[in-house]
Amino acid sequence: MVSHFMGSLSVLCFLLLLGFQFVCPQPSTQHRKVPQRMAAEGAPEDDGGGGAPGVWGAWGPWSACSRSCSGGVMEQTRPCLPRSYRLRGGQRPGAPARAFADHVVSAVRTSVPLHRSRDETPALAGTDASRQGPTVLRGSRHPQPQGLEVTGDRRSRTRGTIGPGKYGYGKAPYILPLQTDTAHTPQRLRRQKLSSRHSRSQGASSARHGYSSPAHQVPQHGPLYQSDSGPRSGLQAAEAPIYQLPLTHDQGYPAASSLFHSPETSNNHGVGTHGATQSFSQPARSTAISCIGAYRQYKLCNTNVCPESSRSIREVQCASYNNKPFMGRFYEWEPFAEVKGNRKCELNCQAMGYRFYVRQAEKVIDGTPCDQNGTAICVSGQCKSIGCDDYLGSDKVVDKCGVCGGDNTGCQVVSGVFKHALTSLGYHRVVEIPEGATKINITEMYKSNNYLALRSRSGRSIINGNWAIDRPGKYEGGGTMFTYKRPNEISSTAGESFLAEGPTNEILDVYMIHQQPNPGVHYEYVIMGTNAISPQVPPHRRPGEPFNGQMVTEGRSQEEGEQKGRNEEKEDLRGEAPEMFTSESAQTFPVRHPDRFSPHRPDNLVPPAPQPPRRSRDHNWKQLGTTECSTTCGKGSQYPIFRCVHRSTHEEAPESYCDSSMKPTPEEEPCNIFPCPAFWDIGEWSECSKTCGLGMQHRQVLCRQVYANRSLTVQPYRCQHLEKPETTSTCQLKICSEWQIRTDWTSCSVPCGVGQRTRDVKCVSNIGDVVDDEECNMKLRPNDIENCDMGPCAKSWFLTEWSERCSAECGAGVRTRSVVCMTNHVSSLPLEGCGNNRPAEATPCDNGPCTGKVEWFAGSWSQCSIECGSGTQQREVICVRKNADTFEVLDPSECSFLEKPPSQQSCHLKPCGAKWFSTEWSMCSKSCQGGFRVREVRCLSDDMTLSNLCDPQLKPEERESCNPQDCVPEVDENCKDKYYNCNVVVQARLCVYNYYKTACCASCTRVANRQTGFLGSR
């Protein structure tokens, strides 16, 4: 029975085995060949020799965007086809591929593994196999077989050794795995080897979906980096130097919300350059086909801003490794950006709360920004800039004409400097801004008491018109927005400026309100179109002088030009805008900068006029009116207008019918000689009387009247028809702040003996905001640190921590620590008082060979800035490179990846004790014949409180005599009045201003002497 059963079972097994052979045939030799070898065997022999020229096919469709917001990347490719393919009547370039039926057609190369090849073992980079010994795999307790050779496969799969000290110091502790990393088990490795033979043929199809999201693709940590410090006892992977961070690195946690959609509903996490398939691979021939040009191009997409609560794309990629053990334990990862430029597109992640980071992937997802604040993004592991056309690597920028990728030929730049020496006060025209101007920049060369003004051609004042000074800000005019800037009067030397993007929709005139010598006004704007011309030469320019860097020849005589310049030199913003071009002097001046534009001959030249008819005695010159008055009030000028008329009919005829030599010369005639209405001239506000809190500010308001192109100060009653502006106003620069103790005293820093305790003291404004300490009175600052006594300590050895730095920056050195025998109240004992078991004070260290390492070099500290109390010390910190026997000083940017030592520190010396403090001496009570001056003297302790511990013998005097000389007026030959109306300056009490004190020196000095004598007599 048993034998029968066993026989049946044998037959059944034989049938099953035979059926399995038919169902699952063994893979043939052809299937095990790599694609390159298959293509080589299937191609006929090439008798051509070199690479055959090809033709580009049409661009394929754009791939899906690699990001859903904040700027992703799309990819577009085109195939390189053999030239004979088009000649044989094959499919047009860009059509679906049928030319090579046995090959997979892909738009881009398949995705590359981020960490290791299929046969690569997780070896520690930088460690010899002979020295390594049994290597412990991360996340596994199974040692590596001794006979297994570690291979690199290719450069992108290996990691270079990172020497200790380059990114900091420290060790990553080895901890037993909390969870077995199944990705590195030997069984998993064997399965990968068995399946790797089919992976290449399936790679193209599997890569069509691009990068999978972190939820779908289990991320693997990058390899651990082990140093070359020699063999150790025990497990070789127990300790390994890794990327170390500076001590001051931020250890905050990122936001928990995700930037992307859930993996179940979206696959946009990594779809980018690796997400599409290649349009055409090379033909299955041994001869290569080459095409000249770009095979693929990238474009920016989905530039809409991500929600504020979303995490950055680097945070999302680093967080995907949170659920994978690293060296036996789990970490939370955050981006680490303090790397050099060529590594900005690697996925470097820092373990939160620890001072090391790991390169988790060689490439970030396409579309990831290279820098936190930069505009370049990463594509295929390379940092590429974004052109103005949104194409990556196009290097196109917007030229000065506003054209993307333009060559600056679509517009003209008009610029110059207004340097005319002005003599009279008031408005003077600087330049005309034509219609359609862009990139307008009108700037004083340096600060002065003059003001810039702007008016439209229609007569509307835009900025600083009608003798009123506007505050800096934005003003709309001419169809654009002008930014009026007036730099701070104390901290800046720059002058006023008008800035506008344009374009303007009407002609605008720029004026200067002249009050002191002209420092020069630079003007520049852009005119679109190649036939644009410059504005009319300003009236202050004489014929034959260079204008805007070009010598311009005017079409009128020098006398006429000078006379017209004198007539137009002074203009009032309240009146009608003078015409820039008249029928007699209309001209154009092409302005082109050297090396940027070439002068051209105008296309609209007027042909020669026909010969006029012969003059006769039937016509003569007659005055037919006058020109408009140059001003509406205050004495202007006008000229008679002469026309050619018929003697009998007095009808006007062409000027060619009259003898031009007999035409009378127009002479200037006065007009509108009545004075202009008086107006209030408003000055600028003075500085606020208080630096914080409510204060007062003042300004000067004068009644002025214009007559004969001069602005005169008149009695205030002439402006009584106008409401007088305010001369004083309240002001508040900022809110006053005070010191606030935010926390209680902390516990003592030592368990016994004398230590320190601290508390938080902040400068807080009256609305509760924390501000800089300079906002509060530093003399009233409460102490934030004090000593504390925790009782006596037992006699014992006291040790400090080992020094963080090795005595040698490279090579062999030592690290040291302090060892002292201490007892009650931290008093020192002889070293033998604690016994003979004294701990070691030095230990060896080695930072690797000296091969041009870059480091910070700090000099010695200077002496304390004060003799007692708290002060500061300084030292030099430079970036150097240590060679064999020399040091090379480098630019500080070369050491930017290293933590820079402080160049300043506080120092505390002995307390100063109570000392006498005094104020400055007051003004003398009399200017002559003996007066006195006083000051306050106080005795203050170290905390700036009143004290009675000062030596009375050392108390400074509180009163002393002054000005014992006789009251004889001293005559200063250089102190004179420059203006005849300085008595008005004295009456208006303007001598407090330096300008009027200098211009009216004699009058202001007499008033000052009278006031001093009056005070002294009292």
Swiss-Prot record:
Name of the protein in its database record: Thrombospondin type-1 domain-containing protein 4
Keywords: Aortic aneurysm, Extracellular matrix, Hydrolase, Repeat, Secreted, Signal
Annotated TM spans: none
Top-level taxon in the UniProt lineage: Eukaryota
Illness the protein is tied to: Aortic aneurysm, familial thoracic 12: A form of thoracic aortic aneurysm, a disease characterized by permanent dilation of the thoracic aorta usually due to degenerative changes in the aortic wall. It is primarily associated with a characteristic histologic appearance known as 'medial necrosis' or 'Erdheim cystic medial necrosis' in which there is degeneration and fragmentation of elastic fibers, loss of smooth muscle cells, and an accumulation of basophilic ground substance.
GO biological process: elastic fiber assembly; microfibril assembly
Ranges of Low complexity composition bias in the record: 201-210
Name of the gene: THSD4
PANTHER family: ADAMTS A DISINTEGRIN AND METALLOPROTEASE WITH THROMBOSPONDIN MOTIFS PROTEASE, THROMBOSPONDIN TYPE-1 DOMAIN-CONTAINING PROTEIN 4
